[in-house]
């Protein structure tokens, strides 16, 4: 059984027991329980259920394992022959969520 959820403006495929990396969930601390109620699709033994746009009475329950920052990317701005270059770095915040159960 799996579900497609919407979280932080993105769509994720989730199953019970997997670890999901989302954009940082600011309102939740490590160890807090998270409920995703924006479920777009649910596939189980009886078939596929598609929401319009979301399914009612379906929740995904998870637990925030940790918050962290991703790998550093470097953005380079460069002008040839002008001795001009700028380098910026960026590390995106993320939240690691363990999916505990799918309730429907």
Swiss-Prot record:
GO terms for biological process: translation. Belongs to the bacterial ribosomal protein bL21 family. One of its GO terms (cellular component) is ribonucleoprotein complex. Part of the 50S ribosomal subunit. Contacts protein L20. The keyword Ion transport does not apply. Keywords: Ribonucleoprotein, Ribosomal protein, RNA-binding, rRNA-binding. InterPro entries: bL21-like, bL21-like_sf, Ribosomal_bL21, Ribosomal_bL21_CS. It comes from Kosmotoga olearia (strain ATCC BAA-1733 / DSM 21960 / TBF 19.5.1). This protein binds to 23S rRNA in the presence of protein L20. It holds the Pfam family Ribosomal_L21p. This is Large ribosomal subunit protein bL21. GO terms for molecular function: rRNA binding; structural constituent of ribosome.
């Amino acid at each position: 059984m799996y579900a497609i959820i919407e979280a932080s403006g993105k769509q994720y495929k989730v199953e019970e027991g997997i670890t999901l990396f989302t954009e940082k969930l600011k309102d939740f601390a490590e160890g807090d329980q998270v409920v995703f109620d924006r479920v777009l699709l649910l596939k189980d033994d009886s078939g596929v259920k598609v929401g319009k746009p979301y399914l009612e009475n379906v929740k995904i329950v998870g637990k925030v394992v940790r918050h962290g920052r991703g790998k550093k990317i470097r953005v380079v701005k460069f002008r040839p022959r002008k001795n001009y270059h700028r380098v910026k770095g960026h590390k995106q915040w993320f939240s690691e969520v363990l999916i505990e159960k799918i309730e429907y």
